[in-house]
Structure formats: C-alpha cells, structure tokens
Amino acid sequence: IDLLARNIRSALSRLESVKVRKVQGRIIVDIDDSDMQEGLERIVRVFGIVSVSPAAVIESRLEVIEQTVEDLVKPLDFRTFRVSARRADKTFPMQSMELARHLGGTVLRAVPDITVDLHDPELNVQVEVREETYVYHETIQGPGGLPVGCSGKTGLLLSGGIDSPVAGYMMAKRGLAPVGIYFHAFPYTSDRAKEKVVSLAKILAGYTGSFKLYVVPFTELQLEIIEKCPERQITILIRRYMARIAEAIAEKEGLGSLTTGESLGQVASQTQESLLVTNEAAHLPVLRPLIGMDKQEIV
C-alpha cells in the first residue's frame, strides 16, 4: 500500500494542494474541488487501484452525517435506493446495520416517492465512519492489477506500432515498471516513427507515473547486417543484435527482463523457431504477453 500511495502521489504531482494518506486499509486523497475532475482522470489510470469514490469528508457526528446524506440525495434522480454503512470507529454509538436503517429513514423523508431495494438499487448511498466520516454514492472502476514497480523493472522494446505499447501496458498492470528501448535506423525507420514512439511513451507514462525512453541509433549496424549477411537471415540477425543491446541497457538500468509485443505467427519472423533463435541472444527472460493474441484482440 505504501508503493501504491507513492504512485498516486506521482500521478497527481502536477496538481496543487493534494494530500495522499493511508487510513485503515484505504488510501484517502484530499484534493481541491477545482482539481477533482482532472485528479479522478489521473487516479483511475493508476495500476493497483480497484475503484475510486469521490466522497464528502465530514465529522463523525450523527446530525452531520444525516444532513450530508440528505444534501447528497436531494438533487439526484432515482426511484430505488439502499444505504450501506460501515462503522470502523467502534466509539461511534450506532452499529453499522442500525446506522444504515436510520439513514435510510433520512433518505425516505428527504425524497418523495422512492422505495428501498437492498438487492439492485438505482442509488447506493455509502457511509464509512472512521475518525472522520466519508459519504459517497459513486464508484468508478480503476484498472486493478498490481502497483507499478512492485515486481521490478522490464526493458520494453518499442517499435511504433500498437503491439509493443499494449505489451508494456499489460506488464505494467502486473507490477513491472517498463523502461522503453527504441531502435532508430534512419532512413529504414523515419523520424516520424521516432516521434510516434515518443508519443506512445508519453501515453504509457500516464499509467506508469514516469517512463524513461532509450533511443538507440541503429542505422550503421543495420547497414552492416544488410550488406554482409544472407537475405533470409537479416531479420533474425537484426532481432538478435537488438536483444543484445537491450540487455546492455538492462544491466545499466537494473532490469530483470525484456518485454516485446511479438505474437506467434503474426509475421513470418515470429514463428517458434525464430523466437527461439532470438531468445538465445539474450540471457534475461523475454516476456511476450501478446503471444497468443491476434491483431484484433490486441487492438
């Protein structure tokens, strides 16, 4: 939870007056109303978060809770509801079920022509009583997964296509912090392709909090391979040299693996035999999270 809180702070670092704190298994983010929308957009991309709920933070006094619940429900359009209460602070005089029933009465008195539905309500008013009380009704799904960095770091071989950033996203979701590695071989790869990779790196940074990108000049080596090697071996040799260079970067950065966007049989160079030959050039494990997917699934 410490790492997750740190990742949330990183995601919100550009916003002012943000405070991230841990409260009994929850992470509470105090944020100005003016920054709420942007803050939510950033938080719901942080891996390790299951859900986010914008909440009113109030005193743990019954009359304050009642008034807050009433103010919350009056503007809303609903016909069925329930109140879910959780009393984490055992000094509060009412137990959870008793508080839920009491606040249900508050809602019934505040809004006409509504009924209680405990199983499938249109509105679920949630109240958590701790040292302070949180009142909310909206739950926004997060990406889930593990906090980025808890599983170590991986070298992500970026190409400019959709496959490699999706692979990086998937490994980040399992707690690996990706470090981008892009091989630029002008004129075989254009400057526009490099700009696209930089753009993809920025998008990934929105999920990982930060993203270091290595741009490796590869033209000279690629020309040597093309000039001196049999044509049918060129692609495999290029991939083997990329793997070796990526391993050198991995040693410098303390990476525990390499990640690629390869998918079995998607192109001629991605057969079992070709992947085996590429693997033999690397000592680190090569992770291929897209290996069993086709292009439609990846997109």
Kindly give the residue locations of the regions a language model identified.
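RNA-binding accessory domains that recognize and position tRNA/RNA substrates
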Residues: I1-G155, P165-F211
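Hydrophobic/aromatic beta-strand patches that form the interior of the parallel beta-sheet core
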Residues: V125, V179-I181, Y214-V216, T259, ...
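A conserved beta-strand->alpha-helix junction
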Residues: A201-K228
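Proteins with a high burden of low-complexity, intrinsically disordered sequence enriched in S/T/G/P/A and R
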Residues: I1, V64-E66, D71-L72, V267-T271, ...
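Conserved G/P- and acidic residue-centered "switch" motifs that form tight phosphate/ATP-binding loops
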Residues: G161
